[in-house]
Curated annotation (Swiss-Prot):
It comes from Conus pulicarius (Flea-bitten cone). This is Alpha-conotoxin Pu14.1. Expressed by the venom duct. Residues 1-21 form the signal peptide. The lineage of its organism: Eukaryota, Metazoa, Spiralia, Lophotrochozoa, Mollusca. Alpha-conotoxins act on postsynaptic membranes, they bind to the nicotinic acetylcholine receptors (nAChR) and thus inhibit them. At 1 uM, the synthetic peptide reversibly blocks mammalian nAChR alpha-1-beta-1-gamma-delta/CHRNA1-CHRNB1-CHRNG-CHRND and, to a lesser degree, alpha-6/alpha-3-beta-2 (CHRNA6/CHRNA3-CHRNB2). At 10 uM, it reversibly blocks nAChR alpha-3-beta-2/CHRNA3-CHRNB2. In vivo, intramuscular injection of 10-20 ug of the synthetic peptide in goldfish causes death, while intravenous injection of the same doses in mice causes unconsciousness. The cysteine framework is XIV (C-C-C-C). GO terms for molecular function: acetylcholine receptor inhibitor activity; ion channel regulator activity; toxin activity. One of its GO terms (cellular component) is host cell postsynaptic membrane. Keywords: Acetylcholine receptor inhibiting toxin, Disulfide bond, Ion channel impairing toxin, Neurotoxin, Postsynaptic neurotoxin, Secreted, Signal, Toxin. Residues 22-49 form a propeptide. The keyword Signal applies. The keyword Disulfide bond applies. Negative results: has no effect on nAChR alpha-7/CHRNA7, when tested at 1 uM. Also has no effect on nAChR alpha-3-beta-4/CHRNA3-CHRNB4, alpha-4-beta-2/CHRNA4-CHRNB2, alpha-4-beta-4/CHRNA4-CHRNB4 and alpha-6/alpha-3-beta-4 (CHRNA6/CHRNA3-CHRNB4) (at 10 uM). Does not inhibit potassium channels. One of its GO terms (biological process) is venom-mediated perturbation of signal transduction in another organism.
Amino acid sequence: MGMRMMFAVFLLVVLATTVVSFNSDRASDGRNAAANVKASDLMARVLEKDCPPHPVPGMHKCVCLKTCR
């Protein structure tokens, strides 16, 4: 193969790798966002169920009162 042909193949490989990497990053962001929402819902349920009668040191009152925004 000539030098130009090798350079063209190199550019195609770099382009293909970039496109695949970009698409997989976008897909994983969506999955991570969904996982974060599920995790926060789970934490809210656990805190709601196991809310102590007296606040735990470092825990804000709004967590048990469901007024946190």
